[in-house]
C-alpha cells in the first residue's frame, strides 16, 4: 500500500497530468482523489493519440478500475463538472466519481466578479473562473455547498471516508495536486498567486487525510519552467528565445501564451523542502534535448539529457525517479525501483 501525492514544483503547467496519468495506470490505485483550488487549473491528458483538457475531473480518469474523487477542499463548478463527465462518458466517469458533499460551489456571480475586478483580471492575471471570489464567500460562511445543488446529488459522498478506507484496506491511493507550489497563497510570489495554498500538506487536507497517511510526495518539474499571468520569473527568457528553442506553449484554461524560463535549481530545492518531496519527476526532457524524444530506457538518453538529470539530483538533493520524454504515457522512464 502506498499513498502518493503529486505536486507541481513550479508555477503550474509542469506536465502533472501526464505524470499522474502514468502513475494511475502503472500503480493501479483503487481511488484517485483531487485536491487543489478548483477549476482554475487545467490538466491535459493524451490517451491513444486523443487529447483531453480537463479542469474538474481527476486526471487519472483513464484508469477505469479506480474510483475518482474531488475532496471537500476543492471548489466545484457544476457546469464545468457535468460537461466533463459527459465528455468522458466512454471512460465511465459518471459512475465512478465522488464529489464531497462539503465542496464549495462556484456560481455565475463569482465568475462575473473575477472577470470584472480590475485588480484580479489585469494586475494579478486571474483565470476568471470565480475561485477567488468563491473562496472569499467560503471564509465568510456564505458559500453554497455541493450538498445544496440538486444536479450534483447523484455524485455526492464522503471523500475523506472513502480515501481513508482505501488506505486501511491496503490499497494504493493517489492524490492529485493542481497548479504549482510557487503559486501558493502563502509561499508563492504574493500577490501574484492563487487564492489558496498549493502544497502537499494542503492537498492531503483537501481530501481529508492526515499527514501520517502520506508515504510519497512526487514534485513535478518541467525542464523549461513556464508561467501564465503576471508576477516575478527570475530565469525568464525572451519570447524570441523561447521560439528558437521550440518551447512555445499556451495555457489549458486561459489560452494565453505561457512565459518560459530556464530551470531554477535554487527554487526547486526550496520547493522540495516545502513539500517534503521524496521523489522528483522531470517532464519535457525532449524539449531540453530533442535527442531524448520517446526514449524509455534511461541508459539510452543523450549525454546532455543524463547530465541535466544528474545536475537536478545533485543541486536539489532529491532523486529523480520519473522522466517524461514525450506526450504519450508510453514515453516515460520509470526508475523508482532501480
Curated annotation (Swiss-Prot):
The active site is at residues 13, 43. Mg(2+) binds at residues 13, 42. Gene3D superfamilies: Adenylosuccinate Synthetase, subunit A, domain 1, Adenylosuccinate Synthetase, subunit A, domain 3. It comes from the Archaea. Transmembrane segments: none annotated. It is an enzyme of class 6 (ligase). GTP binds at residues 12-18, 42-44, 258, 284-286, 324-326. GO terms for biological process: 'de novo' AMP biosynthetic process; IMP metabolic process. SMART domains: Adenylsucc_synt. Pathway: Purine metabolism; AMP biosynthesis via de novo pathway; AMP from IMP: step 1/2. Binds 1 Mg(2+) ion per subunit. Its EC number is 6.3.4.4. Pfam families: Adenylsucc_synt. Its cofactor is Mg(2+). IMP binds at residues 13-16, 40-43, 127, 141, 179, 194, 256. It is found in: Cytoplasm. Its main location: cytoplasm. Substrate binds at residues 252-258. The keyword ATP-binding does not apply. One of its GO terms (molecular function) is adenylosuccinate synthase activity. NCBIfam families: PRK04293.1. HAMAP family: Adenylosucc_synth. This is Adenylosuccinate synthetase. The gene is purA.
